[in-house]
């Protein structure tokens, strides 16, 4: 059905009215650039989309009738908005888990920081910021400069510090990561990477991306002092305990008793994974090809918000899972060869098989962290994901029998 949009518009503390519904060309809820562009045209004032309020229909973060809270920076001319009754107290009321960029003052603050940081770096902005994406996991703005666009990304408190993670990898392989122009707490300014995301890329780029990440991870595993401080710990004893705690929590009510018991049984695989000899290192955490960027040459890896310290097998599996079926063997072979050449006596092929169900359980923990860290109206992005990931783990284990 695609995505249709309604916008609840405020100016300062004043509720002005509603615009919509109107269609937009991109189905994904977090992609707000076409929403803001339509509203600027209709209202003839600059606006920012603050947050999602509700969704009717749609699933998986796309499609349906989506309602957003939108802040106008100037008061629009009268008569442009429909006066519909809404819960104004709920719209403007306090919410402990609200993202800083879901408040107008938070957007203004981070854009001011970005402007100052770019000026200090000799990359002064040449026009207004363009809001590209906003949701509970990040806000992304495109900033025009005389030397090309710069991307401002800001992330929540449960995300890894991308600036320090990228810096760690840049010391080992500068081409593996995007150029960082400036960084601060929960925010980073990145140089533009030409090209495309690598959802359906060539076997050569797949092999290069997988092997270069593994090579960098192997080096960082031997340099623990160079790892960023404050990394989430996902080493096998820790993640095993986190999975057990997850199964003790509310997610159990979404599963049958048999499913919970079977998921607990999978935790015993972690010691077997340790036997494979892979070192703990800096893990990307969401190494699917949509987070690889290439213009035909070696890919740069973006979106390091799920980075952590743990077993790199998670990255090998993520690459395989999201590629077209015919290209998955290339990723698996590249990953196995990369680690086999670096850990004499190790068993990376066995690690991939043992860890396949465990990867799904690890993502179940991560999805629960999302749900625990975001405000209620935005939980629709992730509701049901922990249970779905647990069931995926059970299917994976069953398929291996």
Where are these predicted regions, by residue range?
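A short coil-to-beta-strand element that immediately follows conserved catalytic motifs
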Residues: 46-55, 124-131
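Conserved Nudix-box catalytic region and its N-terminal flanking loop in Nudix hydrolases
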Residues: 1-45
């Amino acid at each position: 059905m695609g995505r249709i949009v309604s916008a609840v518009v405020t100016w300062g503390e004043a509720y002005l009215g509603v615009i919509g519904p109107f269609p937009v060309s991109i189905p994904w809820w977090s992609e707000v650039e076409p929403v803001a562009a339509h509203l600027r045209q209709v209202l003839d004032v600059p606006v920012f989309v603050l947050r999602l309020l509700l969704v009717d229909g749609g699933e998986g973060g796309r499609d349906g009738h989506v309602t957003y809270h939108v802040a106008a920076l100037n008061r629009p001319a009268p008569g442009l908005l429909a006066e519909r009754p809404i819960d104004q107290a709920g719209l403007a009321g306090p919410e402990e888990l609200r993202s800083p960029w879901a408040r107008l003052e938070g957007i203004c603050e981070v854009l001011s920081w970005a402007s100052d940081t770019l000026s200090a770096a000799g990359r002064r902005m040449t026009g207004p910021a363009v809001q590209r994406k906003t949701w509970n996991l990040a806000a992304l703005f495109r900033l025009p400069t005389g030397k090309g666009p710069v991307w401002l990304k800001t992330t929540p408190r449960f995300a890894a510090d991308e600036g320090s993670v990228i810096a760690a990898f840049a010391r080992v392989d500068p081409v593996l990561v995007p150029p960082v122009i400036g960084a601060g707490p929960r925010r980073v300014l990145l140089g533009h990477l030409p090209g495309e995301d690598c959802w359906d890329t060539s076997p050569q780029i797949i092999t290069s991306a997988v092997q270069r990440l593994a090579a960098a991870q192997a080096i960082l595993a031997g340099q623990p002092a160079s790892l960023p401080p404050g990394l989430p710990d996902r080493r096998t004893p820790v993640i095993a305990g986190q999975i057990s705690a997850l199964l003790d929590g509310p997610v159990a009510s979404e599963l049958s008793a048999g499913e919970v018991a079977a998921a607990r049984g999978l935790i015993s695989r972690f010691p077997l994974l340790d036997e494979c000899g892979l070192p703990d290192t800096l893990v990307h955490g969401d190494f699917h090809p949509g987070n690889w960027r290439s213009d035909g040459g070696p890919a740069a890896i973006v979106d390091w918000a799920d980075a952590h310290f743990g077993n790199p097998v998670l990255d090998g599996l993520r690459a395989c899972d999201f590629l077209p079926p015919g290209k998955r063997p290339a990723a698996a072979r590249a990953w196995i060869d990369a680690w086999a050449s670096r850990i004499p006596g190790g068993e990376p092929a066995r690690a991939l098989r043992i860890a396949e169900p465990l990867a799904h359980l690890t993502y179940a923990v991560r999805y629960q962290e999302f749900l625990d860290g975001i405000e209620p109206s935005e939980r629709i992005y992730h509701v049901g994901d922990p249970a779905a990931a647990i069931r995926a783990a059970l299917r994976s284990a069953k398929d291996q029998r």
